[in-house]
């Protein structure tokens, strides 16, 4: 697990089982993207139930931000939920992310992002990964 994304980022959390927007007549949970997934309504993500994938979504690299003179961009991957390789490091953003200055390895990310991951490139605080913010030291 690489993040602690809440259910309400992709699903309406009901008060009751049969509430509108939870399970309709097809008995399949509805996908309704939340503020992190849509980057505060900047994006219009899509869900394709036939191939179990979502696209144009912040969580999988549909983002860009400026840091200093650099424009950092994600990969904007279309992730297939049944394919575990879709969530490996480097699928949502490059290692380092496109536009990042310098040459870095995954093990060096902690130099600026030590509240998120350790010197081995392992995420240590999942609440700070895929949270809609750039977490710098």
What label would you give each PLM region?
Residues 1-137:
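Flexible linker/context regions in extracytoplasmic redox proteins
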């Amino acid at each position: 697990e690489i993040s602690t994304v809440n259910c309400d980022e992709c699903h309406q959390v009901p008060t009751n089982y049969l509430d509108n927007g939870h399970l309709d007549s097809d008995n399949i949970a509805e996908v309704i993207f939340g503020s992190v997934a849509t980057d505060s309504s900047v994006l219009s993500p899509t869900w394709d139930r036939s191939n179990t994938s979502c696209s144009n979504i912040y969580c999988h690299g549909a983002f860009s931000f400026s840091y200093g003179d650099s424009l950092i961009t994600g990969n904007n991957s279309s992730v297939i939920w049944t394919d575990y390789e879709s969530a490996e490091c480097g699928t949502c953003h490059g290692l380092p992310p496109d536009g990042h200055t310098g040459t870095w390895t995954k093990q060096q990310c902690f130099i600026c992002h030590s509240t998120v991951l350790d010197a081995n490139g392992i995420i240590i605080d999942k609440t700070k990964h895929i949270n809609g913010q750039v977490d710098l030291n």
